[in-house]
From Swiss-Prot:
It catalyses: a plastoquinone + NADH + (n+1) H(+)(in) = a plastoquinol + NAD(+) + n H(+)(out); a plastoquinone + NADPH + (n+1) H(+)(in) = a plastoquinol + NADP(+) + n H(+)(out). Belongs to the complex I subunit 4L family. This is NAD(P)H-quinone oxidoreductase subunit 4L, chloroplastic. The gene is ndhE. GO terms for cellular component: chloroplast thylakoid membrane; NADH dehydrogenase complex. NDH shuttles electrons from NAD(P)H:plastoquinone, via FMN and iron-sulfur (Fe-S) centers, to quinones in the photosynthetic chain and possibly in a chloroplast respiratory chain. The immediate electron acceptor for the enzyme in this species is believed to be plastoquinone. Couples the redox reaction to proton translocation, and thus conserves the redox energy in a proton gradient. The chain crosses the membrane at residues 1-21, 27-47, 61-81. Keywords: Chloroplast, Membrane, NAD, NADP, Plastid, Plastoquinone, Quinone, Thylakoid, Translocase, Transmembrane, Transmembrane helix, Transport. GO terms for biological process: ATP synthesis coupled electron transport; photosynthesis, light reaction. The keyword Amino-acid biosynthesis does not apply. Its EC number is 7.1.1.-. NDH is composed of at least 16 different subunits, 5 of which are encoded in the nucleus. Gene3D superfamilies: 1.10.287.3510. It comes from Chaetosphaeridium globosum (Charophycean green alga).
């Protein structure tokens, strides 16, 4: 049973990595990063349940990771919207300069 869950988590992580590498849109990059975080959470909860089914340490840690990922997404989207307001684009290759 754990093998199936780990395969699903690895598959989602690979999809997120592929999207992160090939995407040219900043919002898609953030979505792929969130997909990678969630796939790690799936594997974390699966391993936690497999090794110690009595404890909920893995689930609690996954909730903390979700909270941190939500804060990261909010900050990332705020930065993307601020850059869009100035550059009128969300393409990754246009944000290689730090000056406006």
């Amino acid at each position: 049973m754990i093998e199936n869950i780990l395969i699903i988590g690895a598959f989602l992580f690979c999809i997120g990595t592929y999207g992160l590498i090939t995407s040219k849109n900043m919002i898609k990059v953030l979505m792929c990063l969130e997909l990678m975080f969630n796939s790690v959470n799936i594997n974390l909860v699966a391993f936690s349940n497999f090794f110690d089914s009595e404890s909920i340490k893995g689930q609690v840690f996954a909730v903390f990771i979700i909270a941190i990922a939500a804060a990261e997404a909010a900050i990332g989207l705020a930065i993307v919207f601020a850059l869009y307001r100035n550059r009128r684009s969300t393409k990754v290759n246009q944000f290689n300069l730090l000056k406006w």
